[in-house]
Amino acid sequence: MAKGVVFNGLGRVRKFFGKNPEIIDIPDLIEVQKASYDHFLMMNIAPDERPNEGLQAAFKSVFPITAFSGAAMLEFVSYEFDPPKFDVDDCLWRDLTYAVPLKITLRLIVFDVDEFTGAKSIKDIKEQSIYMGDLPLMTKDGTFVIKGTQRIVVSQLHRSPGIHFDHDKGRASLSGKL
């Protein structure tokens, strides 16, 4: 017979049949991946207050893009997310991807370059928001819904085999591999 019955927040009943009570609570093993993905997207941080990390750093590493002639330059200003079109249950039922539309704001600076001196002066500045595509969102369970199917990301640890020494018999040399 069960010694203790616990109702957790997920609606599941956990029964204990052991003699010793649990000493440590079960850790949330998915929390690391959820926090990492939230830190990558930085959806809850205002665009002008985002640190140069995650998706912000990815865009900053590509921009600014300068024309070969030096007559134009494209700068990254910010990115933003629109709300998702469907919730998780609708995406599972309709075979859709649970995602949010990603829009970035870019600034195009056109220069007027003097042919003789090579001096640049700003001719025109245009700023526009551009739809980049839909970015999959992680659910509260730590999964992604892609075309109506739940997918997970499994972290792997790649260990190097260490140092391996080899000795050729009859020679005075040794070789080593890392």
UniProtKB/Swiss-Prot annotation:
Enzyme Commission number: 2.7.7.6
Reactions mediated catalytically: RNA(n) + a ribonucleoside 5'-triphosphate = RNA(n+1) + diphosphate
Gene Ontology biological process terms, A to Z: DNA-templated transcription
Keywords (A to Z) from UniProt: DNA-directed RNA polymerase, Nucleotidyltransferase, Transcription, Transferase
NAD in keyword set: no
Gene3D superfamilies, alphabetized: 3.90.1100.10
InterPro entries, per database record: RNA_pol_bsu_protrusion
Annotated SUPFAM superfamilies: beta and beta-prime subunits of DNA dependent RNA-polymerase
GO cellular component: DNA-directed RNA polymerase complex
A GO MF label: DNA-directed RNA polymerase activity
A Pfam family annotated for this UniProt entry: RNA_pol_Rpb2_1
Family designation: Belongs to the RNA polymerase beta chain family.
Quaternary data: The RNAP catalytic core consists of 2 alpha, 1 beta, 1 beta' and 1 omega subunit. When a sigma factor is associated with the core the holoenzyme is formed, which can initiate transcription.
Function (record text): DNA-dependent RNA polymerase catalyzes the transcription of DNA into RNA using the four ribonucleoside triphosphates as substrates.
Name the UniProt record assigns to this protein: DNA-directed RNA polymerase subunit beta
Biological source species: Liberibacter asiaticus (Citrus greening disease)
Primary gene name: rpoB
